[in-house]
Amino acid sequence: MCLICGQHCEHPVYENGVCTVCGTVCSHDFREGVCAICREACPHAGHDPLTQRCTVCGLKLPHSFFHGKCACGAEPVFYDSLLPAEFYQDCAHPGTVQKQTYSQKLHYQGDEEVTKNLNVYLPYGYSEQEKYNVLVLIHGGGDDENSWLTKEYDFGFPLIMKNIYDNMIEQKLCRPLIIVCPTTYNGPYYSNDGGIEQMAAELRETILPYVAEHYSTYAQSGSLADLQAAREHFGIGGMSNGALYALGSGMQMDLDLFSNFICFSGNSQPYAVAEAINAEDRKNLPIPFFYAGAGYYDGQWQNTFYGFQIIVEQTDRLTEGENAFYRDIDGGHDFGVWSVNIFNALQMAFPEERDGS
């Protein structure tokens, strides 16, 4: 109320829950994530373990499996065979895929410059006003930048990986995220693969700076310092040959840029990876999430399983069941297995410690 005229203030503008005219603190009426009066975001102090709805505003929230368990008491649901059919179907609110290109020097070929393709998945409702975690997914041998997103695989039904991300986000089984899919090949017809050193350089020099400059991520800019400061919000994964890149380029060489790691049906010199992450300049960098998995009948099962065990055993920053997880899936070396493992991994990736939610 105005002290001069005695009239009630209409509270036209609030900042941080306080009226800028009369100083009245908003009483808050939180609904679906925001206060209906001052538009302040709900603090989400807790959510129901079954409905996943915030106990204050009613908004459905993804679990945050920090140390393998959400603060609400829920634990992740892992599948070990093909997912329920609904996750492979088109989603009512699909994300979009943007096809981009970038110029890159091939350091192993005298810095020859080539133009490369890059696919970027944006979740439904993507907004420049929000910040998003970023997951780089790398294809396997003979595949390309489309395999993790839009390429169709026949499993008696059309299996398109993008549908899994769309449906998980729609059902609040994972937080909305940006997925970046580059190609390891530097020539036509799946030729001229530059190896993990070249991909590590591309991620550091070009891909991550490009994503940070063109999309709404937690990195304030594409500078190396800003990317390093936001590393907890960047992850890298891959299947088959892509798993070698995820661990070799990502964990072994670019640990200062990535903190979440996903490895399916492959591994890259685990002792060398362990030695690199324990180096003096890397030993204090947290690794909040590491997931690996393979099919029971996959020829890469042994490399995947034992490689995971070696890396976990060689560092005190990884504890199986808390921030390191391995799953065997009923199947072989194919996208049926990888579709299950990406579901298992995405519900846990980018863990955030939250009180009561």
Predicted regions and their residues:
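Non-catalytic cap/lid and distal C-terminal segments of serine-dependent acyl enzymes
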Residues: 77-357
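Extracellular adhesion/carbohydrate-binding repeat motifs centered on closely spaced tryptophans
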Residues: 1-76
